[in-house]
Structure formats: C-alpha cells, structure tokens
C-alpha cells in the first residue's frame, strides 16, 4: 500500500510550476528532482541497494549519453547525433583516473557494444562503475535510437554512504499529469527496494532545479 498521498504530490507539482511562472524565465528547462531521505538504515551494515526503473515519460530529454562502440555502433551513433567513442579513443585515456572521472562527469549515462563492454574494466579501470555509470549493453539486434530513449526514461536509485539521494523525475516542459505518473512510479519502485519499505522512508521532497523544495511525505 502506497503511503504517498496523491493530493500532496499534485499540490507540490503545481506549486513548483507556479513558482517557475512567477520567477524570471531561465534560459534552460528546469529539471524536477525527487529528493529522498531514509531512516533506520545503516549503509555500513545493511545491503546497499541499487536498482533502475523505466519511467512512463522521459524526465531529461537533453540527457547526455555516450556510445562506447564498435565500428558499426559508432557509425549508427553518428547518424542519430549521439556522441560516441571507439576502443582506440578509450585506450588513449590510458586508465588515467582523472581522465576517466572527467569522462564519467561529462555524461549522464553510457551505452556499449558487446565487444567493447568486456574490455571496459581493462581499458578504463573501475572509474565508471564507481560513478554508478557502468554502460548498458546494446546488441546489434536492437535499435540504437530506441535504446537511447529507453536510457533517457530510466532512473537509477543507488544507496551510497549517506542516507539521502535524488533522482530526476521530470522537467518543467512536461504536463502535470506526466510528472505525477513519473513521481508515483519512482516512489513505489524505491520503496520496493527498501528493507522495511515505507518504514525506511524519512522524507520525500520534490524540487525544481532553481526552486524551493516541496515536502510530499
């Protein structure tokens, strides 16, 4: 049973949108983030969960994705305007921690061809994994474009050392109903990952990039 009150979520979404309309316009579309505080969890002892869920609507259309590809995938990536790197380019990073960290920071997510994904630990070391951005496998049987869209719609919940986290659940160019559906799905999925479900949730806030946080739980 979800303890999230639909009314509270709807109110938070409309107050975020109202706040945005009343303040001076930004030259970018603000993202709406779900901020989560947990309780009764010990990141040292309890299992640190990690899970991804595909939302009904893409929260960040401008999300930056990079294809770590074989020749065919690099060519396909070029056609759809997707940034890509081949094995030679990855070798040039020379496992340099700083460069790998910089690469992980530059993109929100990575995709990789089968022949490349196997070589990633050897080519890059643990950097992408540490950043929680280990690439998603793409086979030649799937459409690269639909894999990109699927990746843009997927959010990842990962518990690190601290008991709080944030995920993008929408943006201010979306309809309220779409944001609401994304929030519901994100929260229900997160709760399913928690050991004691709702008993581990301390608080939930919704917030746009530049706006104040709105508590929904």
UniProtKB/Swiss-Prot annotation:
Gene Ontology cellular-component terms listed: cytosolic large ribosomal subunit; cytosolic ribosome; nucleolus; plastid
Family matches, as SUPFAM superfamilies: Ribosomal protein L1
Alphabetized UniProt keyword annotations: Ribonucleoprotein, Ribosomal protein
GO BP term, pick one: translation
Keyword 4Fe-4S: no
Superkingdom of the organism of origin: Eukaryota
Keyword Ribonucleoprotein included in the entry's annotation: yes
Any one GO molecular function term: structural constituent of ribosome
Family as reported in the entry's similarity comment: Belongs to the universal ribosomal protein uL1 family.
Record note on quaternary structure: Interacts with the GTPase NUG2.
Designated name of the protein: Large ribosomal subunit protein uL1x
Source species of the chain: Arabidopsis thaliana (Mouse-ear cress)
Organism taxonomic ancestry: Eukaryota, Viridiplantae, Streptophyta, Embryophyta, Tracheophyta
Gene that specifies this protein: RPL10AC
């Amino acid at each position: 049973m979800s303890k999230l009150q639909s009314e509270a979520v709807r109110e938070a979404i409309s107050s975020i949108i109202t706040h945005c309309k009343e303040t001076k316009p930004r030259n970018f579309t603000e993202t709406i983030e779900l901020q989560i505080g947990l309780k009764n969890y010990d990141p040292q002892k309890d299992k640190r969960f990690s899970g991804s869920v595909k939302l009904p609507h893409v929260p960040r259309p401008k999300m930056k994705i990079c294809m770590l590809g074989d020749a065919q995938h690099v060519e396909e990536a070029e056609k759809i305007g997707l940034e890509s790197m081949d094995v030679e380019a990855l070798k040039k990073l020379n496992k340099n921690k700083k460069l790998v960290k910089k690469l992980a920071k530059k993109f929100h997510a990575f995709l990789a061809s089968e022949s490349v994904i196997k070589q990633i630990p050897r080519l890059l070391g643990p950097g992408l994994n540490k950043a929680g951005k280990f690439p998603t496998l793409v086979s030649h049987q799937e459409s690269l474009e639909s894999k990109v869209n699927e990746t843009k719609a997927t959010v990842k919940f990962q518990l690190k050392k601290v008991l709080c986290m944030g995920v993008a659940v929408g943006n201010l160019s979306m309809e309220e109903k779409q944001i609401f559906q994304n929030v519901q799905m994100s929260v229900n999925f997160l709760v399913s990952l928690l050991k004691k479900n709702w008993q581990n949730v301390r608080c939930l806030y919704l917030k746009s990039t530049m706006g104040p946080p709105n508590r929904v739980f």
